[in-house]
Amino acid sequence: MSSSDIFDVLNIQPKSSSPHPQTSQSNAGASKTPKPQVTGMQRELYNLLGDNTPPIVIQPTSKFKDRLASLTKPSPWTHTEFEATPYVKLSHWVKGSKELLEGQSPKSSFAKYDQKLTLPEFTEGEYQEFMAQAAKGANSDAPTWSYEEVQYLFDLCRRYDLRWHIVYDRYMYDESRTMEDIREMFYTVCQKYFQAKDPGNPLLPSLAYSKDQEIQRKKYLTRLLSRSAAEIAEEEALIMESRKFEMAAKKTLQEREAMLRLLDHPQGDANVSQFLTSQGMNQLYNNLLNDKQRRRKPDSAPPENPWMKQQQQFAQQKQQLQLQHQQHHQLRDQKRIEVKTDPVTPGSPKQDSPSPGRKASDQSAAPRMNKKQKLEMQTAMRRKQDSEYAQHLLKNFSSEERKSLGVTLHGEKLAPGVFLRSSKISTFKPSIQNKVVSVLQELGLPVRPAMPSAAVVQHHDELLRRIVTLLDLKRQQDKLEAEKAIVK
């Protein structure tokens, strides 16, 4: 394809040379001038450029391939035969001319990997000799195989490189033989052969083969592979429990070592057996804590600061004034409650009011309390007053009426609003809660009562507390048994 074809495709009119004779002459002169030869580009590709000639033409400067082709000659390859085995001949390509390879005996390049096991070889007389000698030395009347069968077995082992499954599959001399019988006979003959040749050979014990042990191993492996999913899960759970016991034993030993390191000096006259029990360890731990607290106390009191002493006196006076004011309000409230609950009859004598001197003496004799103690005392007195008021309201109800109406006197503070009795059932930590649920399932009881009446909820709560107590006792017992096992 030339540039004129491209112009025709793009519908471009080329420049005409008829109206301009000078230009045509110049073009003719230019066409007569020889064009420089362009290398590195195909002629057809160069013709497609048209008037848009590139300023620089990329030319390859490397002559490596040309030089390589000119300097080297192709090496000859010959298709020759080689012997893979004495019975099989194959062909392959070998580098070199046929004349050079004719006088050589070609061998396979993989012949070096064809290694055979070196098994003992013996004649029938030698076999009878060392077998009789071994039987005489061992004083055993064990039956032996014939020489032909032993030779047949050794030929199979030599051919299949002691691959026992293949040897057993190809063994046709006596089909009643098992794989264990074949292996036992092979190692027995080898051991007796080397004992006759070199009795002091240290490799003789490695030729011992136990047929019974191999049978037991295969039976155990068969049972292991035929386990069900439940048996596998049970074994994994037992392994986890054993690891937990091991970790608990290690932790107990570490705690014991850390506690023994806290001792200041070893007591030579004391018996170590008293610290091997849990009671002895608890006693030792309490003694160490008491010694540590006793040593923290200063031997002598620090010097007294007069400014701090004055501030303490001001604080004590302020506390006394607040306490007096509080007691005054409490007495006034108590009198109002007594007037409401037990009104004074006209004929009853009035109680003697406390005299000012007695009141002052009682206030001076009152102990000094801090802010926290005063708040606790106020809370206790308020609860006592509420309980007395509730008891006064409920004294007109009998026990049957209280039970039928569901009226009870709570000692604890309840949240405001309506709630379910089942929501007040005791709950525990997740680890303890799971154990409690398992115990309830063993007893055939639901986790939450179906009819949560007041009596049922009370008995259920009491049952849960007893279960937790029993679980705690069981945990302590397991810990003591683990300690006994560690001591043993």
Swiss-Prot record:
Where in or outside the cell it occurs: the entry states:
Nucleus
- The biased composition feature labelled Low complexity covers 309-325
Keyword set, alphabetical order: Activator, Chromatin regulator, DNA damage, DNA repair, Nucleus, Transcription, Transcription regulation
Biological process terms in GO annotation: chromatin remodeling; chromosome organization; DNA repair; negative regulation of transcription by RNA polymerase II
- Where does the record place Basic and acidic residues bias? 330-341
Q: Where is this region: Disordered?
A: 1-37, 290-387
Q: Which GO terms describe its cellular component?
A: NuA4 histone acetyltransferase complex; Swr1 complex
Q: Name one GO molecular function term.
A: transcription corepressor activity
Q: Name one Pfam family in it.
A: SANT_DAMP1_like
InterPro entries found in the cross-reference section: DAMP1_SANT-like, Swc4/Dmap1
Carries keyword Chaperone? no
All copies of the SANT domain together span 137-190
Detail the disulphide connectivity of this chain as listed in its UniProt entry: none
Could you tell me where the Polar residues compositional bias lies? 13-37
How this chain assembles, per its entry, is: Component of the SWR1 chromatin-remodeling complex and of the NuA4 histone acetyltransferase complex.
**Function statement:** Component of the SWR1 complex which mediates the ATP-dependent exchange of histone H2A for the H2A variant HZT1 leading to transcriptional regulation of selected genes by chromatin remodeling. Component of the NuA4 histone acetyltransferase complex which is involved in transcriptional activation of selected genes principally by acetylation of nucleosomal histone H4 and H2A. The NuA4 complex is also involved in DNA repair.
Q: What family does the database annotate?
A: Belongs to the SWC4 family.
What is the recorded name of this protein? SWR1-complex protein 4
Recorded source organism is Eremothecium gossypii (strain ATCC 10895 / CBS 109.51 / FGSC 9923 / NRRL Y-1056) (Yeast)
